[in-house]
Amino acid sequence: MSIRFVAADAHWRVAPLPGLSAAQKDWLTRGGSLTAHLRALGAVAVRVTREGVALPWPDEHAALGLAPRAPVWVREVVLAVEGVPFVAAHSVAPLAASAGVWQAMRRLRTRPLAELLYSDSSVARSSLVSRRLTARHPLYRLAACAIESLPPHALVARRSVFERHGAPLMVTECMLPALWAHLATVSGAGGSGDWSAHPRVREHGRPLEHTASRAHPATRASDEQRR
């Protein structure tokens, strides 16, 4: 399965925009769990900002193969590292799937969605796509609620579709300015968190494949301990 897009919407790209920074290109194409990558920077907390039934965004329904006004289950969270918001995430699944194949997403509360996506061998993931966000996009407005102020046209986001037993779940992640500021500080100090010091598997342009084998090592170790 691949993400299906409306031909008129050319904003989402398989390869990151050439004008983005090296750090942005790196984080937009990292495979595995984003939560696990954030944990390498510090303690991660999940704050749920919205959860319930809604309508898909204009650039979501076609990608999920849904009718424009088909109801979906939405989960929106902010991922904070050491108390500072680094990522605003928006996940959406067909309403029927959220009560069936993906029903566990309704019970996560403040646990990360990665717990479902990277410990189940029946879950597969599409390639990653990314784009720059403007104030007109609903994800930009979601990000604005997570922090006090946003510079115009300063946000980038990525998305992919996870599939389990034929049911899709789309995850869109918007990186916030504090993430780039932190990476720049760590990189400038030559610390162990330097983004360039840790090569990662790149997911853009890859076909759908199972996620359990691609989980971050820390995630796999945690899963094994729970067993």
Swiss-Prot record:
Pathway annotation from the record: Cofactor biosynthesis; ubiquinone biosynthesis
Keyword GTP-binding: no
Positions that bind substrate: 75, 113, 173
GO molecular function: chorismate lyase activity
UniProt GO cellular component terms: cytosol
Keyword Cytoplasm: yes
Gene Ontology BP term (one): pyruvate biosynthetic process
Catalytic activity as recorded in UniProt: chorismate = 4-hydroxybenzoate + pyruvate
Predominant subcellular localization, coarse grouping: cytoplasm
Keywords: Cytoplasm, Lyase, Pyruvate, Ubiquinone biosynthesis
Pfam family, one: Chor_lyase
InterPro entries: Chorismate--pyruvate_lyase (IPR007440), Chorismate_lyase_/UTRA_dom_sf (IPR028978)
Enzyme Commission number, as recorded: 4.1.3.40
Biased composition (Basic and acidic residues): 200-212
Region (Disordered): 192-227
Protein location: Cytoplasm
Protein purpose: Removes the pyruvyl group from chorismate, with concomitant aromatization of the ring, to provide 4-hydroxybenzoate (4HB) for the ubiquinone pathway.
Family in the record: Belongs to the UbiC family.
Protein name, UniProt field: Probable chorismate pyruvate-lyase
Organism per entry: Paraburkholderia xenovorans (strain LB400)
Gene field: ubiC
